[in-house]
A protein has these predicted regions:
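The feature primarily captures lumenal catalytic ectodomains
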Residues: 1-234
Length: 234
């Protein structure tokens, strides 16, 4: 496996599918994760929920390994059918239809923050949304929360990958930096059979790192889109 498995978004987007493929093809007896000496908690919980024995997982940082047979997993675009299957595996199967509307705040993040969140959040709150910082939740709690969610909004970031755990037909509202617009989350939303909405935002300052800039969003545009989502939900 490649060396980006400590990136939450890439883990969900690509590595989960590779683990499932390894299981199907009988290649999951010994899985090597290069470059890191320890797996994160979400790495471990994913592996456990896929029912792969942890004894089969071997993180390593050695320069040279000698193996009898090595299978390399090709780094290719994600497969929607794999992500939908993973959602079915880990979903909480609540008898109650999804009811939450979740706004994920990046106020605890070190970068890519919403500068005018104090103006934006009251609009969400007035329409019955709840504010969440994903840093406060375990991986299992994030899955449970999203399985109960019918509408989701946030700035683009790693936590956006959690939309794969939302039930089919949910609404996804991305607040996107218009200078670095990407189709990644749109493609993911489509793959999971969600409705997708886009709200553009504007840079504040200029971070030397690509795509790390803080942003401001147009509160009137946000309110307009939220009204459309609310109409669709009701």
């Amino acid at each position: 496996f490649g060396m980006w498995y400590r990136n939450y978004f890439l883990w969900l987007l690509t590595y989960v599918s590779r683990l499932m493929l390894a299981m199907e093809t009988g290649c999951s007896d010994e899985i090597l994760f290069p470059g890191e000496s320890a797996l994160s908690s979400y790495n471990i919980r994913t592996i456990e929920r896929l029912k792969i024995p942890m004894k089969n997982i071997m993180p390593y940082d050695e320069v040279v390994w000698h193996v009898d047979r090595l299978t390399l997993v090709h780094d290719e675009p994600f497969r929607g059918n794999r992500l939908r299957e993973f959602r079915d595996i880990v979903s909480c199967n609540s008898p109650r239809p999804p009811w939450r509307k979740v706004f994920v705040s990046r106020e605890k993040a070190q970068y890519r923050r919403l500068v005018n969140q104090d103006e934006v959040w009251p609009i969400f709150k007035r329409m019955g949304w709840q504010k969440v910082c994903m840093e406060d939740l375990s991986f299992d709690d994030q899955i449970k929360l999203m399985s109960e969610t019918r509408a989701f909004s946030s700035l683009n970031g790693a936590g956006f990958g959690n939309i794969i755990f939302m039930p089919k037909g949910a609404h996804v509202f991305e607040l996107c930096n218009e200078e670095i617009m990407s189709a990644s989350f749109y493609a993911m939303a489509c793959a999971m059979d969600h409705h997708y909405w886009l709200g553009k935002s504007f840079l504040v300052g200029k971070d030397y790192r690509y795509a790390f800039d803080d942003v401001i969003v147009d509160i009137h545009a946000v309110e307009s889109i939220l009204n459309l989502i609310e109409y669709q939900l009701t």
